[in-house]
Amino acid sequence: MKKIMALMLALVLVFALCACGGDKTPANNASTATDVSKAPESEAPAANGGDAAFTTAVSGKLIMATNATFPPYEYYEGTTVVGIDAEIAAAIAEKLGLELEIDDMEFDAITEAVKGGKADIGMAGMTVTDERKESVDFTDSYATGVQSVIVTEDSDITSVDDLFATGASHVVGVQRNTTGDIYTTEGIEDAGLGNIDRYSKGADAVQALKTGKVDCVVIDNEPAKAFVAEVEGLKILDTAYAAEDYAIAMSKNNTALYEAVNAALKELIADGTVQAIVDKYINA
């Protein structure tokens, strides 16, 4: 009888231990399920400049290099840089969960700032050119521009063709390292049809025109309209010097950020945000 009782007690203990072991298995599975559910968050693209999908020059920020003397694309209202590029950049930053910070600098420093990683994007009504593509990558185009010619109202230059006429010898004012500079250097200066005076700001070139130091100014059409509206005695020729595409300059060494910015830009173009921003500043 004692043997039977001992055997029954042993069996009870075995079942009890098995039951306890069974309780532990679901607990472990629950813990594993929780970890798996959190994994996508840690691996998802994090727009914070951290170690996730992409990095930025400053964690949590999108640094935009610009030259804020280019209305209506970028210019100052008080101490704040506003304009088409500023608003598009802000919309991109918002999509990426970043804070936009604008760094105003000389135009010819923008490409180097982007190339060297001091800025994440370069926006300054920047035209895509083969020369610039050697240093930086460009996103999809978000706007088109036209190079226009500003002259005094009594100028003997009546069309762009006059700049290329046989025996022409005009002094052309441009903003240094802009496409106006590039185009006129190749088409006028290198061809022996005149000289190019280069200025750090478009406004300085326009002032040189007003005071007679240059015969005309070649500059993007939208700032040209703004300058002519501000300065009496100037006009824009009816014929354009050249047409071009504006895009965002980015480093060749940050593919992940490039893809994120370009994807955000595409979405903003597709949903009409970019066009709405352009229309806000430019009347067709």
PLM features: what roles do these ranges have?
Residues 68, 144-153, 221, 225-266, ...:
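Periplasmic-binding protein-like
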